Amino acid sequence: MSLLLQGKTVIVSGVGAGLGHQVAATVVRDGGNAVLGARTEANLAKSAAEIDPDGTHTAYLPTDISDERQCEALAALAQERFGGVDAVVHVAAWDSYFGGLEDADFGTWQQILDVNLLGTLRMTRAALPALKRSGGSVVIIGTQSAIASPNEVQQAAYAASKGALTSAMYSMARELGPHRIRVNTVLPGWMWGPPVQAFVTFTAHTEGVPEAEVHARLTDRMALPDLATDGDVADAAAFLASDRARAITGQSLLVNAGELMR
């Protein structure tokens, strides 16, 4: 049996220490070539070296997805190095701004929308010529909070930007379907990886309670006893990027240990 992404070339945006790194590692593990993009070259080099020490199945380029020319350059690198693009997985996002409407800095909101919404669309459009030649897949990493009220952390701007992407997914799926390009979204809930680990540690320190207590607040809401991990979300993205999802488009897949079901 062939590997899930055997011979496929996948652009992964937002490759840092967390989910982006895990997605790129999963692509290579499953037989594909990963083309890594992120703003910081040192992070890209570190990820590529860990994932693919001999450099056979990875390439990378510093990329700010708010810059259309940089998106085009990353797509061109995939074409030059591996001969095409079979999928794009959008992990890059601005997710470090907290708060709701009443205290909103709309200038920051505009920047978040420019990265999370328009940046994803820029990167998708940059890859379209290659995707049209191959047929293929666009996988957006969204968030459960785009479709349901969050319980612990208020990130209204982030949720709004990802909710807009979920709506854009439907239009793109319809527009690009005739070219055999599928567009889907993975919606993680609480995901055990560096950001959530930091949240648990910070909250425990702030409240003066054990980390296990904070962790239990999260898992108590799940149908399954363990939080999803970065690896679980990466596996879902790899499936949607693969030919085994050839008849799936315009869909949102929750990866959340059953916290929200729909």
What are these model-derived regions, one by one?
Residues 2, 95-98, 238, 243, ...:
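Short C-terminal tail/terminal secondary-structure segment
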Residues 9, 16-17:
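Conserved glycine-rich cofactor-binding loop
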Residues 30-46:
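Conserved glycine-rich Rossmann-like NAD(P)H-binding loop of the short-chain dehydrogenase/reductase
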Residues 99-101, 105-113, 218-219:
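Substrate-binding pocket helix/loop in short-chain dehydrogenase/reductase
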Residues 139-164, 169-178, 191:
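Catalytic loop of short-chain dehydrogenase/reductase
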Residues 177, 182, 248-250:
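Short, small/polar-rich loop/turn modules that mediate ligand/substrate recognition or access, typified
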